[in-house]
Structure formats: C-alpha cells, structure tokens
Amino acid sequence: MEWTDDGIVLGLRRHGESSAVVELLTREHGRHLGLVRGAAGKRMRPVLQPGNTVRAIWRARLDEHLGMYAVDGLTLRAAELMSASHGAYGVTHLASLARLLPERDPHEDMYFRLEHALDDFADAGAAAAHIVRFELAILTELGFGLDLESCAATGETSDLIYVSPKSGGAVSRTAGAPWADRLLPLPPFLRESDEDHGWSDQDLLDGFRLTGLFLLRHVLEPRGQGHSDAREGFINAVTRARTRLTRA
C-alpha cells in the first residue's frame, strides 16, 4: 500500500530513541497516523512541528497497519504561529478539534479550512473568527450542523440575529423578540450573507459561546470530554491581545 498526499501536522508522540508517530490531517486521506524514522533529528524536527504543511508518502504492507511516513516540508509556518501570544493555544485547540474527526475518513473541506485558518493567524481577531468557523464546520461534519440560513420560526432569510439553544436554528429579530433573553446572539460574521463582515470583541465571544454550547452537548459530553484548556487559553490570549491593540 502506498499513497502521496499533503497534510497538516497535528502532533506527534515519541517512538523509541529517534522516531515518532506523526498525526496529519491530510487532504485526501483524512486524519492519518504514520511512523517517521529520524523524527528527532536536526533535519526533521523543525518540519514536524504542529501547524506545518508537509508532503507525505505513506507506505504499509496492509491498509490497516500504522505504516511509515516519508515527509518533506511544504509550508513551515510553525515558528511564526508560535511567535504570537495566541498561537500555541490556537494551534493546540485546532488540533484537538481535528481529532474529533474519524481517523482515515476523508474530510477535504476541513483540510482546506484548517490550512486557511493557519495562513491567516497573525491577527488575533482573524484567528478567533477562523476558529469559531472551524468549530461550526466540525459540528456540520459530525452531523450536528446548525441551520443559520433561515429563521426556524418563519422561514425568513433576513435580519437573523438569534439562534435557538434548543434547535440550533437561526431566529429573526421579529420572531425572536418575545424570547430574546432565552436565545443566543448570532454574530454577524457567522451569517452567510455577512461572511466578510468585521467583528467586535463581543461578536467573537458570542461566536465561541454559540459553538461551545453545541460542541459540548452533541460531541464532547457524549464522549466524556469537556472543552480543552487550550480553548480557554486561546480566548483569553485573544482578548488580551485585542485589548492591548485598542489601548495603543
């Protein structure tokens, strides 16, 4: 068995003195692990950092085997990612989200979403918006997508400003007014018609509150998990970074 694919490094664990089992989110083969010999060496160590994009050749005698990776770096962005205060938290959290996907199950859209997020990570606000959208996409990929395109009560497609915490459906301003205190805010940057809309600090926090609720309910708690410490660390780091920018 052999294939070649591009992949984003999610993490690795040491195997013996110089090798490592490397976890990639690949474009065509999904989340996939393989053994890399010499992973601890000077040449491979900087290549196999989380957040980097690599070209990987996977070989195994049988498809169900762990197999071996031969890896070359394509986009080595890890050092730049880690230079930002929110970088390490963000990369760690994105990796934990990607690990919710079934192993070896292709999710090409998620690969491109992750790559796009990592390429636009320098600005703390943009990074936060990307992660909220990535969390939303993870829910969709796992079968728990939110319907944010039309009002759950009336079918309207405009003036959608709420989300029902029960159904996960959008609610228009008029339909939601009597129950506004029971509904979740729908940040403008998550509405399909406002994808290029900017975001305030409150918009970002509302986005994390929205996706966080449904991730816990439908994905994490059924697995006996909670939100990662990296998620909270990322949100706090972004808040501090944007506060410093506002005061400057």
Curated annotation (Swiss-Prot):
InterPro entries with a match to the protein in the record = ARFGAP/RecO, DNA_rep/recomb_RecO_N, NA-bd_OB-fold, RecO, RecO_C
GO cellular component annotations, sorted alphabetically?
bacterial nucleoid
What is a single Pfam family found in this protein's UniProt entry? RecO_N
Q: Which UniProt keywords apply?
A: DNA damage, DNA recombination, DNA repair
Give the highest taxon in the source lineage: Bacteria
Signal peptide (residue range): none
Any one of the GO BP annotations: double-strand break repair
Q: What does this protein do?
A: Involved in DNA repair and RecF pathway recombination.
NCBIfam families in the record: reco
Q: Which family does it belong to?
A: Belongs to the RecO family.
Name of the protein described by the UniProt record: DNA repair protein RecO
Q: Which gene encodes it?
A: recO
